[in-house]
Amino acid sequence: TVVSRAGAKGLMQIMPDTGFWIAEKLGEEDFTEDELFEPKVNIRFGCWYLKYLLDSFSGNRKTAVAAYNAGPGNVRKWLNDENYSKGGELDRIPFKETAQYVERVQRAYDKYTKLYANELG
């Protein structure tokens, strides 16, 4: 049972409120918070949510990953603030944890893209 300092649960570190929201969107009426510890549920919810965020932010991976970590509300605020956004693109992330998270995800993405270049075409 993996729980972050912030209370995110399971393999894909989903916050309980987000889990309930996802369950509602997926029509999972009997969802319980403890199901976030079940890998099959957690991965399905996390993948669905990441796809939702990618769709919400026009396929921009950096922005979607930032929203996965910091929440879409925070990211929308940053996108509307010239201190953090240039030309509708997230230029600077004010939360250090989120900025580091986005960098780690991008490094992993680049690494796996190279590693599986032949399979990905």
Region spans (language model):
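Catalytic glycan-binding domains that act on GlcNAc-containing polysaccharides
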Residues: 1-121
